[in-house]
Amino acid sequence: MPSIANTPEPPYYAVIFTSQRTEIDIGYDAMAARMVELAAQQPGFLGVESARNEVGVTVSYWADLASIKAWKAHAEHQEAQRLGHQQWYQHFKTRIAKVERDYGI
């Protein structure tokens, strides 16, 4: 079962990746798993949450904008982005937001 990320006290940043997939599935699951594994090793990474139906939403949490920029520039992540553009995504949008408050149980 997916879990909710255990994030620190705000402020921190959320990268919200919303997508609609193509029908091409070759290599997608392995790459998605690798990206979560690799992101978790990056400085400033705080956690990730993901859900998919017709529209997929993945939210990764980061300590600062510099960490997000470094992750975007990571060589393996750039390869995943290239394959996503070419094969896996029909549409996508990435949004970056500053989390100023959070609460929950």
What is each stretch, according to the model?
Residues 1-56, 65-73, 89-105:
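Short S/T/G/P-rich N-terminal loop/turn motif that feeds into the first structured element of a domain
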Residues 61:
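Catalytic palm subdomain of template-directed nucleic-acid polymerases
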Residues 80-87:
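C-terminal structural segments of small proteins and small subunits
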